[in-house]
Amino acid sequence: MRALLSVSDKEGIVEFGKELENLGFEILSTGGTFKLLKENGIKVIEVSDFTKSPELFEGRVKTLHPKIHGGILHKRSDENHIKQAKENEILGIDLVCVNLYPFKKTTIMSDDFDEIIENIDIGGPAMIRSAAKNYKDVMVLCDPLDYEKVIETLKKGQNDENFRLNLMIKAYEHTANYDAYIANYMNERFNGGFGASKFIVGQKVFDTKYGENPHQKGALYEFDAFFRANFKALKSEASFNNLTDINAALNLASSFDKAPAIAIVKHGNPCGFAIKENLVQSYIHALKCDSVSAYGGVVAINGTLDEALANKINEIYVEVIIAANVDEKALAVFEGKKRIKIFTQESPFLIRSFDKYDFKHIDGGFVYQNSDEVGEDELKNAKLMSQREASKEELKDLEIAMKIAAFTKSNNVVYVKNGAMVAIGMGMTSRIDAAKAAIAKAKEMGLDLQGCVLASEAFFPFRDSIDEASKVGVKAIVEPGGSIRDDEVVKAADEYGMALYFTGVRHFLH
């Protein structure tokens, strides 16, 4: 038996090599891997000695040789293949262990294009693909986490075709991921991220019980190990729908730096939000906006879930809590609640990945765009359109309302008062309907909107929403502007003594 080991990530390779040697494998290797194995007392043959061909062009050509690929690819059950191998002095290679040059790491650490190019692996992917193609005869490894499993399988004599097939699938996933990252990087560098092809690659974190509905299959995939690093289940497991709501709630609650923000989300839309002097007060005021919709919702906490906050949340049924951190006494509060799910990021405040791009599936393909964000200076740079200016407190509320609106399904309007959302209308086909629905819900909840502010994620096409806002005492409004009837909207604001700001930036969300 013969194994070829050539790895960039050398974690566990010495131990793996020793185990293979003990199992009777002859070991071939290259470069740094060869040196490391030899230094650790493993009998190893350098590939250039095996092929009788030197490494060429500063190591660019090492393993691209018929004796390597012939040794991997020839079928052991095909008499013609065996005959050709003997005629050409090609010896079988039964195990290939390769992981690739750290291209991604290099792009993160350096902008030197020559260095980046040199970290595109050629021989490694070729060997992995060859071994994967001939999986019926050859084992292929590209992940150090598989070393122990492979050794145990070999020791137990369970190296069957099904075992090798699973390694084969993983190998092709590995090379596809590698090539996709290279192609995306080149398009990002030279085509602004929008090249002729776009590759979206995720790593599976876990299967969900089902998808959006029980008859659908679902799973969570991640970019750059974000969930593995920042998502820990403390109580129960997240469903498919939980994950989408957690995403919406976390994105909103984490958008205010270190502020004690609480967001309550139901079916992807916020039904409560507040920033008060502490998290307990934030939760109390967030819940007031729509305590009916909050039932069975997701609560995101930009800080630590402690016992006091846990007791307050425990007064109603919420399905999910996602908190930056959770203390033990808080967990104890929910000990007898079987249905609640609790997750933490184990950090002082909530963490977002800030993905640069966003995509949505459409029938037959997907649309792809830069991710939307409310700029830090968006309100600061907004143009005052009215005669009246907003007060300092109103400006704080306008910023909160703006950010909530950006994370809410269009068409939407958001009313905020003293740091808390007091009304919201979302997902409506007309903006005036969103405005009216929000006011109706606020009245149902017994909330006083007098003195609140209003934000809209897109322009008001008519003055009717301003007229409605005046009836409940709105004092300041922020919107993008851009309607052919902007003059009518400005006139209405001045009639009612409102402050009106145009940001020039729309935040549709579909």
From Swiss-Prot:
Superkingdom to which the source organism belongs: Bacteria
SMART domains the record matches: AICARFT_IMPCHas (SM00798), MGS (SM00851)
UniProt keyword list: Hydrolase, Multifunctional enzyme, Purine biosynthesis, Transferase
Molecular function (Gene Ontology), one example: phosphoribosylaminoimidazolecarboxamide formyltransferase activity
Disulfide bonds: none
InterPro entries assigned: AICAR_Tfase_dup_dom_sf (IPR024051), Cytidine_deaminase-like (IPR016193), MGS-like_dom (IPR011607), MGS-like_dom_sf (IPR036914), PurH-like (IPR002695)
MGS-like domain location: 1-142
Pathway recorded for this protein: Purine metabolism; IMP biosynthesis via de novo pathway; 5-formamido-1-(5-phospho-D-ribosyl)imidazole-4-carboxamide from 5-amino-1-(5-phospho-D-ribosyl)imidazole-4-carboxamide (10-formyl THF route): step 1/1; Purine metabolism; IMP biosynthesis via de novo pathway; IMP from 5-formamido-1-(5-phospho-D-ribosyl)imidazole-4-carboxamide: step 1/1
Biological processes per GO annotation: 'de novo' IMP biosynthetic process
An example Gene Ontology CC term for this record: cytosol
Pfam families named in the record: AICARFT_IMPCHas, MGS
Recorded catalytic activity of this chain's protein: (6R)-10-formyltetrahydrofolate + 5-amino-1-(5-phospho-beta-D-ribosyl)imidazole-4-carboxamide = 5-formamido-1-(5-phospho-D-ribosyl)imidazole-4-carboxamide + (6S)-5,6,7,8-tetrahydrofolate; IMP + H2O = 5-formamido-1-(5-phospho-D-ribosyl)imidazole-4-carboxamide
Enzyme Commission code(s) on record: 2.1.2.3, 3.5.4.10
Iron-sulfur found in the keyword field: no
UniProt cross-references to PROSITE patterns, sorted A to Z: MGS (PS51855)
Similarity comment: family membership: Belongs to the PurH family.
Comment block on domains: The IMP cyclohydrolase activity resides in the N-terminal region.
PANTHER family reported for this sequence: BIFUNCTIONAL PURINE BIOSYNTHESIS PROTEIN ATIC, BIFUNCTIONAL PURINE BIOSYNTHESIS PROTEIN PURH
The protein, known as: Bifunctional purine biosynthesis protein PurH
Organism: Campylobacter jejuni subsp. jejuni serotype O:6 (strain 81116 / NCTC 11828)
